[in-house]
């Protein structure tokens, strides 16, 4: 069967992939620079073809709780927003993490803090990887650096979310969301039937069929001893995720004396910066974390054994650099370069930062 290749925006790829990967429901609210997700879904009308429901909620708060409710019934449910909207969703996300309910959240980041700007940013790294709500919890975080990965990561996010009964986030940004590239769309995957949901998700609140105890979805537990055990179980789950689900990519690292560590659109910019640097005789390669949680700590620690220094490039004031420094543990210099206010760094600026900070 011939592959279907189309030209589209990253946001549009999210919408097409959601329909094709068996998503049962999308609940969202428009906000720049991710509005094309819900706009595309409205145009495609998947409720008439696959049965996928698309709801424009009254707010981001309502959106995440609709996801919580649908996912609590074992359905593949998702939402998308941009930075201020995802900030509003944090209460619902921590509820889902505490109740061990899977769901997918897409964050097409823009500049902040506060209302900030509609221009691109990577300023939500800490919020995504540390858990922006209350309590000790983690969200699985995937960081696409192309429109193709925007499409591919929707199904991957659902697979990981249901495998570990945990919210999963696709942490994109305004560059990837708005840029247009060729995409190979994934094949259609049928939505699960109600019987399949009952069989595959015994934890889900699907009513009370015969020979089954009732299921209550909640993050609340008033007995400290039981709550401690639930928290310890969560931490054990996060350890398993860290052990089994790390994903990363390396480019031109074989002969590299220096490394750039970057994710998302910053990694795309760094690819060009590496070309420029190598033309000037600087041997540098790229290490791109694809999962931000679980973070490739061990792999970066190994990387540090063979490099003279690392430059972390991110479109923020310096967030992922903290995790890189923890991984390197002082073995080699680790510096950071970024732009703020919605300004995207030029490749030449990255090369100059490499020279200024590590040479």
Label every model-predicted segment.
Residues 270-303:
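Generic long, charged, amphipathic alpha-helical segments
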Residues 36-130, 140-162:
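Thiamine diphosphate
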Residues 165-250:
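Conformationally flexible catalytic loops at phosphate/diphosphate-handling active centers
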Residues 9-13, 235-258, 271, 275:
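Glycine-/acidic-rich phosphate or pyrophosphate-binding loops and their flanking alpha/beta elements
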Residues 6-43:
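N-terminal glycine-rich anion-binding loops that anchor highly charged ligand groups
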Residues 139-195, 349-359:
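Structural signature of the thiamine diphosphate
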Residues 314-359:
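Peripheral docking tails and interdomain loops at the edges
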């Amino acid at each position: 069967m011939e592959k279907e290749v189309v030209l589209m925006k990253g946001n549009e790829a999210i919408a097409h992939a959601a329909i094709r990967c068996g998503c049962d429901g999308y609940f969202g609210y428009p906000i720049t620079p991710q509005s094309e997700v819900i706009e595309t879904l409205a145009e495609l009308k998947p409720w008439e073809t696959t049965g996928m429901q698309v709801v424009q909620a009254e707010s981001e708060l309502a959106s995440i709780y609709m996801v919580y409710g649908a996912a609590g019934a074992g359905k593949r449910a998702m939402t998308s927003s941009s930075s201020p909207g995802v900030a509003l969703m944090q209460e619902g996300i921590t509820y889902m993490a505490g109740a061990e309910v899977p769901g997918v959240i897409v964050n097409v980041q823009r500049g902040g803090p506060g209302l900030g700007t509609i221009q691109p940013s990577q300023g939500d790294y800490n919020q995504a990887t540390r858990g922006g709500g209350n309590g000790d919890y983690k969200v699985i975080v995937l960081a696409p650096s192309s429109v193709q990965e925007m499409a591919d990561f929707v199904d991957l996010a659902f697979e990981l979310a249901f495998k570990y009964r945990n919210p999963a986030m696709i942490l994109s940004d305004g560059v990837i969301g708005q840029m247009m590239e060729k995409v190979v769309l994934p094949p259609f995957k049928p939505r699960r039937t109600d019987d399949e949901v009952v069989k595959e998700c015994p934890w889900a609140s699907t009513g009370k069929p015969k020979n089954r105890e009732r299921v209550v979805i909640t993050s609340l537990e008033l007995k400290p001893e039981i709550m401690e055990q639930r928290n310890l179980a969560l931490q054990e789950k996060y350890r398993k995720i860290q052990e089994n689900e790390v994903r990363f990519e390396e480019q031109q690292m074989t002969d590299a004396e220096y490394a750039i560590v970057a994710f998302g659109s910053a990694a795309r910019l760094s690819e060009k910066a590496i070309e420029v640097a190598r033309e000037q005789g600087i041997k540098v390669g790229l290490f791109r974390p694809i999962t931000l949680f679980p973070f490739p700590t061990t792999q970066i620690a190994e990387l540090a054994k063979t490099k003279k220094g690392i430059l972390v490039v991110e479109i923020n004031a310096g967030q992922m650099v903290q995790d890189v420094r923890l991984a390197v543990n002082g073995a080699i210099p680790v510096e950071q370069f970024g732009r703020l206010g919605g300004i995207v760094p030029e490749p030449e600026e990255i090369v100059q930062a490499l020279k200024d900070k590590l040479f």
